[in-house]
């Protein structure tokens, strides 16, 4: 029986239920992919590992999957050396044939590589922070950013300037991922080009993501759609481009005066003043 270890950025719903935690509202493609693979290849033994805010490691067996929750001492965007011992324990206990790290944006998967090696490891690209960091301001000028700094930004030391720097630091860790692993999974010519530039010796595998079931249950129909609506799946920071959509709205409204913008997720502005970000302002 093949043994596959997934390293993810979220806690899956099953262990969330065991721990009394709210289930994540994002990353649904990973759950759908896990369910689809288990149906197609029931002989594969799966384990899913991630980090959580706690003091001890937990192992949960449910629905035929083993879940490992590793205690994180620091913010997951920074490297946590204490995770290396836990990863060695997971590796020795589960003995995976293949390790699949979902995403290179966070540092906990890199701790596995440093502790256990990369010979049987592949990573899949969810976004390349080392590249995105270059464009983090997304056309905002120095003055645009400076004049909109809020109380929340100052207290948390989290202006758009600092956010860009954090992306750059995460990008340094991401490049170590990509330079080390022999196999990389992606789905666009954009990520393939950047992977080749960083590690031309890695073997690139094209693979589209599996969406949540709801995306396959209904079809878009013009007669039933909310016409002249622009939908943004995220808008919490500059690279998602909300400010560019707003800049374009006068031109759009000239031709389609009933145009609406809908944004998924929490409001950027409907909150106390001390919680509004500079970008939300």
Language model: regions and residue ranges:
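Acidic anion/phosphate-binding donor-loop and adjacent secondary structure
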Residues: 196, 210-227
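Short hydrophobic signal-anchor/transmembrane segments that target glycosyltransferases
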Residues: 40, 115, 243-257
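Short N-terminal targeting/anchoring amphipathic segment
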Residues: 90-106, 112, 120-122
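Active-site proximal beta-strand in glycosyltransferases
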Residues: 4-7, 98, 115-156, 185, ...
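N-terminal subdomain of nucleotide-sugar transferases
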Residues: 1-55, 61-66, 252
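A conserved nucleotide-sugar
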Residues: 249-281
